[in-house]
Structures are given as structure tokens and as C-alpha cells.
């Protein structure tokens, strides 16, 4: 049985650990904090429980798959409740726009704001579907870990106009500034700037239309907790407060983890869910990284950070949707 290690207990690390285990590997997951979740951390204060990271689920099938790998059903442990609307926009001119699953209702709202944009939206959706089919369904499963791989798929990226920004893409089809804002907001979900992020991210619009947007009852922390239980049921070892200090390489392969507590372990398979630039520059070292990673590190730009305020309220605001954006 191969020995596998996963660095990082975010959703990516959890998924990697479960998939490795389903293929027969003996898996150990190392998390530097005292809880799993990564950006999906949970904190409690004054009797309130806050999800510090994501609060919606846009590709539920990915989580269903993880339970199905072991003959289990997600619905036996979790409830994904569909949201309607998905987002509510309150604009500076006092107009409101609900973006949600009801196509006819949404088209009616677009017509009230800008009649000329109804046809434009349908054309935009058609093009977004094309980007989704090519960018998500055909390319998302391919690893872009080598420079030649990126070059190979460059024509497809050009075909999708990946050199344009999401806002430029949306503006080709919609005229009204409020609608342009509403339909170019998706990059913010991944820390991107709509005016700079590649138009490939317009596929998120199609992804939302295809699978919907859901809230996990009990919060995202509930989802993390049930995935943690699933890992434990399957014999995955979870090591908390294990901070990786550096990685040893042998024959151009990473073979050993070294931790800040002085311990080290060798593995047959190592998967990292940590920040790629941190891994290549700090954990591996600049002198040992590949030409591809050196190229990426030189030109990569970090996404924006956020300043987030969390409020606790004893009152329910029925006119405030789950995601309300001013």
C-alpha cells in the first residue's frame, strides 16, 4: 500500500485525501491549524457562529462525489438548500435586481432596467455556455503543471478570448451599467478583479445556471465537519498543528516532509493544497523549482485581500437575501 501525504486541510486537501484513500493509498493529512477548513474556517463569538470563508456552494456534485466514493450518501449527513435569489443587488440609483434560478423572472427584471439588454443577455449566456463547455468540462481536468501543456491549450484559451477581462466580456453584450456590474461580479468570489480577471471566469455564470447555488444548513463549518468525519471513517490520519517547514526532493520528485516541530516523514505520494507560490519558493526553494514554476512565480499576481466585518443580530431581516450586494 502506497503511503500518501496531503498538505493543507482546505476543501482541496480534503478532497485529495479522500480520492487517494478511495484508490487504496494509506493517507495522512497535515494541517497547520487546530481545525480543518482552510479558508472555510468557523469562529464563535458572543454566542454567534460565523463562517469566515465561503457561504454558498456552486458545484454541489463535487461534494456528492466524495461520499459516493465510499458507497455513502451526502444527504444522509447534510442538507444543501437551494437559494432564491442567488444574489440581490441594490444599486446606487435605488433600483434592485434579483439574480436567481427563475429565467423568466430574471429576463423580466432585465427588461424593466434596460429593454435593449434582454437579447444581449441571452447572447451572453450562449457565449458563456460555450466557454463553460470548453474551459470547465474539457480543460478543467487537465493539469497545467508544465509550460508545454499551457502552450498546447493556448489556442483554446485564445478562442475563448481569455485575454479579455470579465467586465469587457459582459460589456460586449450588455449596455446598462447596473447590469454590467451584476453579471461581472463572479470573479470577486475567487478574489479576482472583474476589470482584470480573464473572461474565462464568465463560465461561473453557466456553472451557476447548470447546478444552482446552495446553502449548507448549519453553515459551511457543518460541511467541513461531516467531511472530517468521513475521512476518519475511512481511516485517513489527520494531523493538526503540523506546519511544514520544507520539502526534500530526490530525482526531481518531492519525497519527504519536514515539519517545524523537528519531525520528518517520507512518502510515496505527496499532494499540496497550500499556496503554490509559497510551496515553490519557501518549501522547495527557488533553486530546485522547475522552469515552469519559475516562470509562473515571476509573472504571477496575488489576488486581492478582504477586510470583512462580521455582525451578530437577534433580529431577522426578511428583505435581505442571503447574498445582498450594495
Q: Can you describe what each PLM-predicted range is?
A:
Residues 78, 158-159, 298-303:
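Short Gly/Pro-enriched turn/cap motifs at secondary-structure boundaries
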Residues 92-197:
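Rossmann-like flavin
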Amino acid at each position: 500500500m502506497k503511503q500518501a501525504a496531503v498538505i493543507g486541510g482546505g476543501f482541496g486537501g480534503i478532497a485529495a485525501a479522500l480520492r487517494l484513500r478511495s484508490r487504496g493509498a494509506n493517507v495522512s493529512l497535515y494541517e497547520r491549524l487546530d481545525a480543518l477548513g482552510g479558508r472555510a474556517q468557523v469562529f464563535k463569538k458572543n454566542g454567534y457562529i460565523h463562517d469566515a470563508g465561503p457561504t454558498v456552494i456552486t458545484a454541489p456534485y463535487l461534494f456528492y462525489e466524495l461520499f459516493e466514493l465510499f458507497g455513502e450518501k451526502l444527504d444522509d449527513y447534510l442538507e444543501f438548500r437551494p437559494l432564491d435569489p442567488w444574489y440581490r443587488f441594490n444599486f446606487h440609483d435605488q433600483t434592485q435586481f434579483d439574480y436567481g434560478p427563475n429565467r423568466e423572472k430574471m429576463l423580466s427584471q432585465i427588461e424593466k432596467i434596460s429593454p435593449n439588454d434582454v437579447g444581449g443577455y441571452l447572447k451572453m449566456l450562449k457565449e458563456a455556455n460555450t466557454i463553460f463547455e470548453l474551459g470547465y468540462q474539457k480543460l478543467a481536468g487537465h493539469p497545467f503543471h508544465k509550460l508545454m501543456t499551457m502552450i498546447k491549450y493556448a489556442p483554446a484559451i485564445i478562442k475563448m478570448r481569455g485575454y479579455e477581462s470579465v467586465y469587457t466580456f459582459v460589456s460586449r453584450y450588455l449596455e446598462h451599467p447596473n447590469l454590467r456590474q451584476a453579471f461581472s461580479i463572479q470573479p470577486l468570489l475567487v478574489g479576482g478583479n472583474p476589470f482584470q480577471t480573464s473572461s474565462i471566469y464568465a463560465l461561473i455564470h453557466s456553472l451557476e445556471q447548470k447546478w444552482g447555488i446552495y446553502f449548507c444548513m448549519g453553515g459551511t463549518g457543518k460541511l467541513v465537519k461531516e467531511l472530517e468525519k468521513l475521512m476518519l471513517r475511512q481511516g485517513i490520519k489527520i494531523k493538526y498543528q503540523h506546519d511544514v517547514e520544507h520539502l526534500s526532493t530526490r530525482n526531481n520528485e518531492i519525497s519527504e516532509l519536514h515539519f517545524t516541530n523537528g519531525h520528518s516523514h517520507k512518502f510515496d505520494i505527496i499532494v499540496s493544497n497550500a499556496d503554490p507560490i509559497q510551496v515553490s519558493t519557501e518549501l522547495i526553494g527557488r533553486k530546485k523549482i522547475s522552469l515552469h514554476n519559475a516562470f509562473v512565480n515571476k509573472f504571477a499576481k496575488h489576488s486581492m485581500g478582504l477586510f470583512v466585518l462580521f455582525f451578530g443580530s437577534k433580529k431577522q431581516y426578511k428583505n435581505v437575501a442571503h447574498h445582498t450586494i450594495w
